[in-house]
Amino acid sequence: KKSYFNLPKKFKYIDAITDIDTDLQSNFTLNLDKTYKMKNYNFSTQGKVKKVKIKLKNLSSNIVNMTNIDLVLVKDSELKLDLANKKRSINLTGKYTLDNKKYLEYNIKNNYNTKSSQLDLNLQFDKRVDLQLINYFKKDGIIANLSLNLELQKERLKINHVKFIEGDTQINAENVLFDKNKIINLKNLSIKTYNNSKLNNDFSLSLGKKIKIKGSQFDATNLPKILNKRDRKNSFSKMSKNIDIEFGSI
């Protein structure tokens, strides 16, 4: 049976959830005081998600150019959901596809309340990825592994860590802070990438009052063009233009 949900505005990246087929067991508890006023509540459910269709929106980035993604199909997944009056959590593990052909593995954990949200994500990803800043390109069909831990509070986003692995390519970042979609700080970024099987990036980077870049190889083909962009969506506009570089090859 087809189901449809209109989601709250805070789910700005999800437009609709449809075609839901699940086998779940749920439990609800409610505590009242002497005047029968609700003190707290808890709703929990767990079981199998046989299939679900998730329609996405507003997925765009000035940093990463990817294949357009507007629909996710999920199947053969395990769901555990806890909703309390002060905090909530979701744990979902199984398989997903973006093209209704190849299904890949994923795991999502989300803890959230009215003020903040923390997300742990681990998944396989086989769509195109174009990181213009470092001149790295991954073709459609090549599977990469992505792990991510982030915190969201109002208009501030903090990525505690992110790891992207595709073959010999590895990209790791720690403590990346965004304010209104602009990067304002990055503790450490280590990058090792290949272009046409040739090493084109092998360096570490930190962002603060200065941009510090150190390593043996850095593909700066697109860097001047990106840093000088003036459009409102430029994610790098709040970054320092003071760059300290120590390299063997640029």
Show the residue positions of the predicted features.
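Membrane-proximal interfacial segments on either side of biological membranes
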Residues: K1-I250
